[in-house]
Amino acid sequence: MSGRDNRGAGGGGGGGGGGSGGGHHHHQPLSSAMGKLKEKLTRVGDDLGYHRVESNLSTSNTATSLDTILPEDPFLFPQEAPQRHPQQSPSQSQQQQRRFLDDEPPLSFRPLLEDDDINEPPTQQQPQQQHQQQHRSPLSASGSLELTPLPPPPTTLEPRDRQQRSIPGEDLQRSKQSLKGSRVSFEKTNSKQAAESSDEDSFEDKRIGFQQQKATSVDHKGILKDLKHILANDNRRQFQAKKHVSLDVKGTRFLQDLLKESSSEEEFHKTRREFQGRKHQSLDPRVTFKLDKVLQGSSTDSDEEGDDAEHKRLIHRPKDITKPVIIDLKDLESESDEDFLTSRQHFQQQRSISTDSRKSRRLYEMDDMGNKRGDNIRHAVPFVRQITEDGKPKLEVYRPTTNPIYIWTQVLAALSVSLGSLVVGFVSAYTSPALITMTNGNITSFEVTPQAASWVGGIMPLAGLLGGIAGGPFIEYLGRRNTILTTAVPFIVSSLLIACAVNITMVLLGRFLAGFCVGIASLSLPVYLGETVQPEVRGTLGLLPTAFGNIGILLCFVAGTYMDWSMLAFLGAALPVPFLILMFLIPETPRWYVSRGREERARKALSWLRGKEADVEPELKGLLRSQADADRSATQNTMLELLKRNNLKPLSISLGLMFFQQLSGINAVIFYTVQIFKDAGSTIDGNVCTIIVGIVNFMATFIGIILIDRAGRKILLYVSNVAMIITLFVLGGFFYCKDKAGIDVSNVGWLPLSCFVVYILGFSLGFGPIPWLMMGEILPAKIRGSAASVATAFNWTCTFVVTKTFQDMLDVIGSYGAFWLFGAICFIGLFFVIIYVPETQGKTLEDIERKMMGRVRRMSSVANIKPLSFNM
């Protein structure tokens, strides 16, 4: 009986005992025994083969299931070999086997792709493919698979049904899952070579050798080699510990080579910046940016051509479309430099992760990949984490400025508005020296009664109250700069009215107009400086108006000793002229432009203040965000906005500082310095004492300028409070001993002057300038104009009350009672500062506002999130 007839007539035992063949009944017991042995060996062989494949997969570098391309043992699956007649010799069987293999049709293979049905069971219409899957051999030298010749079975076995030669359904399903994305080419078996394999051990040796071979993907093997080399390199770890390197691991290697080959650190930094400026690649080594247009021609030196070529080789690996790709970046490929930079920045913002981090190591750990058994990497380690725009609680509005030209533009702006403060100081101190000559009938052509003299000193604070109320709408609708500018001409007019006065009415009218301008200026000057000066110098430049105000007071005291009230008024009319000229040179605040929707004007103002070469876009974006937040929460009624809970706290702190500033008695001391020294019986001339007080006030302000950005606001307020408390109680004790106890104090006549000097020194360090400075810092942007108006009006109200009632206070409770009352108020103010006043040193206005209002507003993103910084 021929082999073909035996295959057709034999009864098949699918997985169990052997079927009985036709015709040779004397071999039936032997066939039954061999069938059972064959069934057992089949089960053992299947389990052994798959266990080996699975154990090898756990440590394999590829995600390809090897069991689908292993040749099946013809001893375990004898139906694959041509059936040999029991009486045939081995040589005849081998010849018949060669003819069987030669008669087989050509084998055709194709890669198993994603769209293959993994649940498709083997059918009878697929015998050729099933036959191919069971006869695959180890890889050839070219990377393809060849069919291995099958040795003839050692004994005579009954044939099986041809329909049962396929792999079981569950094994085929697992094999197809693991082969997804892989690309394997196959070649037809060489029939002559197949006939040369005759012993049983060759199959086991070849299968073990095949399983021990490395990954079939040359590209993947190269990437793994590079990654393992980088991760195991101690020099790279030491390099990364000192420097912040690129996210791209191949870029890291490139930077390390640059560092080794650079002759100096400066050359390395230059080359690194050029490299990072044109290249930022994904962590995934299989994702490639098209950077040919950027990289070509970027290196001109012959020494760098090798590094450039190596770098191009690393980032331009050949792609295999059948391999799984973690992220598809086709949408990020740009056609222009601008689009490329935008796409790169967008990609960088999706994920910031260091190549040396634990998560990055896990991404490339082959054990983790093997344990997933062919799953896509994106399911094992997430690669992209979407971040929201509000992910980073930080606003990058201000940046430190070190270029002197940037500082001097801000100094010019501060100096210009400070000249207005000099005029304010001169006008405020005018009554102290002027009333001495104004009440002299020999000098003045009109009569000045004591009551009229009291109104000359007291009407200015009252007018300042009205000016502070009107100044709020002015700075919102006219602008900060324009509001300050409009006070220059009225200052000149008011001084001319006083200088040319022929009656007391003209003097009072001039003082009222001057006081109105003082109220507006005292409101708008701090707001302007707070919105134009950077945090690094805001404390120092913010005290310039106070310093120039003290200069104006000192100038008035000194000039008053040599001039009468009329000539002193003419001097006051000349001081606003340089102030008027300089105000035309400085710009409006960028914040006001932003509040009016004039973004381009705001950009130009920032460029003027920060310098033409400065990058003002981050600061401008911060201003736009702040204004957008303010617009969303703003109401139509501005005054009702002040009463909101979030706005009430900063407004209350500002009002409290103004209250304790004026109730410390400073204006009473300044306005009535000469009279106080006369009442003290001091042997020193009153005008000289006034000049000494002015000099101390001026010098103390400059000490505060030096310390305010070093020690902080609250420390200076503590020192100021303690100094005023001690001196006021000592002065009260001095006047009590002199007026009430009748003790002779002539031997301590120097004590009032000493106490006044320490008192002025303490006031000028803290409570003099800081309330005005913090008014421009702690008030929220959306209510800054109206809140500053209320605070200024409250300050001038307190000034008017103290100045107008100080003489009456002396009559009722005496000098000692007045000073003790002021000292007690300062003692309460110390606890107010400790409990409620925040420290604003070195903080941006947005940071201060968030802290004061007790909420977190929408922030800029990572981010901001800032794209990855390559500063080392």
Swiss-Prot record:
The chain crosses the membrane at residues 407-427, 455-475, 489-509, 512-532, 539-559, 567-587, 651-671, 688-708, 715-735, 756-776, 785-803, 817-837. Keywords: Cell membrane, Glycoprotein, Membrane, Phosphoprotein, Sugar transport, Transmembrane, Transmembrane helix, Transport. The keyword Oxidoreductase does not apply. It comes from the Eukaryota. Residues 1-406, 476-488, 533-538, 588-650, 709-714, 777-784, 838-872 are cytoplasmic. Residues 55-68, 84-98, 121-132 have a biased composition (Low complexity). PANTHER family: FACILITATED TREHALOSE TRANSPORTER TRET1-1-RELATED, PTHR48021. Residues 1-40, 53-217, 262-281, 293-315, 340-361 are annotated as: Disordered. Its main location: membrane. Glycans are attached at N442. Residues 344-355 have a biased composition (Polar residues). This is Facilitated trehalose transporter Tret1. GO terms for cellular component: plasma membrane. Low-capacity facilitative transporter for trehalose. Does not transport maltose, sucrose or lactose. Mediates the bidirectional transfer of trehalose. Responsible for the transport of trehalose synthesized in the fat body and the incorporation of trehalose into other tissues that require a carbon source, thereby regulating trehalose levels in the hemolymph. The modification Phosphoserine is found at S262, S263, S264, S334, S336, S860, S861. NCBIfam families: SP. Pfam families: Sugar_tr.
